[in-house]
Amino acid sequence: MKTNKSILLIKSAIIAFVLTTLYSVIPFQAVCAEIPNNVFRFHILANSDSEEDQTLKLKVRDKVLERTKILFDTANSKSDAEEFVKANLETIEEIVQNEVYKNGYNYPVKAEIVNMHFDTRHYESYTLPAGMYDALRITIGNAKGHNWWCVMYPSICISTADEGKDRAKDVLSDDEYSLVTDDKVEYKFFIVELFQKIFV
């Protein structure tokens, strides 16, 4: 009898925990789902993990950010940023290819806009939730090396930390901004990812 009572109590506690978690996750997950609608990301894949190829990846990054900084700084929306990239994909690819040649390599390169899954990622004072994001992706050579990423719009990766915060605050809703700048939010992101795998 006591055993049955204990089992019932344990089951009740588990159900209560699951329901409480779901009620807290659902609104949080809704805010997470909105963030990709306001963010345009930048993703570079190096040829390999050799020191030389990783150094080349960073040189390509610096060159692309240098050449596009003003335009991304003046974009008024994610759509503006994405349209700029679409209209200039060939130019961006040429910038990348020239930087690769300049450094003594003959790797082919590709610049494209993709909608891809990113895991939960940290960037300076930001944590972005996992999800499907639109991004400018640049691949160098075999694209088998470690990647580099940042946020092109709002232009966090080409700003100082304070400037990036100001731009993010202008673009994101109050709930979204609070979520990505909360340094205690990672556990909730993990719960959301688990929730998405089970129910989505």
Segments (PLM) and residue ranges:
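Hydrophobic membrane-insertion alpha-helices, especially the h-region
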Residues: 8-25
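Aromatic-capped interface at the extracytoplasmic side
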Residues: 23-36
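Extracytoplasmic
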Residues: 37-39, 55, 104-108, 131-135, ...
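Early exported N-terminus immediately downstream of N-terminal targeting peptides
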Residues: 38-89
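Soluble periplasmic/extracytoplasmic beta-strand elements of cell-envelope proteins
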Residues: 39-45, 108-112, 135-139, 149-151, ...
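Amphipathic, coiled-coil-like alpha-helical scaffolding segments used for oligomerization/assembly
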Residues: 78-118
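Acidic/histidine-rich
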Residues: 98-101, 109-137, 143
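Soluble extracytoplasmic domains of inner/organellar membrane proteins
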Residues: 126-185
